[in-house]
Amino acid sequence: KRVEKKDRIGAAERAAVEAAAGGPMAVDAYGRTRITSLYLDTPERSMIARSVEKPLYKEKLRLRAYGDAAGVALVGAFGAGPIVREPGGLPLSDGGVETRVASGLQVPGAAAALPVFFGIKKKFKGIVYKRRLALTLPAALAFVSGLPYEQACARWPLSDAALAAAALSPATRQIAREVEAAMDRWLPLVPSVGIACDRVAWAYRPEMLEEREDDELFDSELRITFDDCLEYLDCHRCRSPWRPIIESSESVMEIKSAGPYPPWLVEVLSAERIYPASFTKYGNAYQLAEAEPRARNH
């Protein structure tokens, strides 16, 4: 539960924010990371069409992978032919799952056991709530296609024993029920858009957290992320290429907070005239994808 604000900014604005953050914060241990997300939606993209109208409540279903190999595997597996979750439909067979996973791997077996994250992102009155599951790519394919969550995890477990056990804990099963209910609210469900970016995330330095440990007004969970090389893939188009969402010199800055911004952040945002703006990666990719046929016909 937190407030997330995204802004599309230029190189100079990004440099100013990073310079201001460089005292109390630092780039996290992951450094620059390739992130690939795949959004599920109805064939008409009803979920995102409703979302861009800015209702009080909206939700998105998203699969996510971290790293180049896992991202390629995710998009390749879900894009290797039609996959539809529909009322009364049968889940993919074991052979169907294995074939799809193999088609998405650059190196056979390289990413099959790496976790992908599948969840629901809800937004109500500006507050974001996220519920997500960690599971293998084969298990994610099977679960999305209709296999019960527990069966999918048991058939294709995570390689880490502790993570595999956590995936079947009562708390995680409850999250799975919520994700499953969200999927079933939007049937039929298909892969809609893939989105990839390079991310750098900033978080407070450990010494800053220790120093402000007793400060009730200090938001220790504050994070600032910068996404660049942002591009999308239209899953509705066979062999569609990746296309840019923003200019190469731009970044999407996201500030994730559970409380008020610290003075240094307010100061740099004001100095650079960076004001809250409505920007969603899936929303912008959707609008670009929908405009593409019309552009080609003129």
Q: What function would you assign to each model-found segment?
A:
Residues K1-H298:
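Phosphate-end processing signature that detects enzymes handling 5′-triphosphorylated RNA
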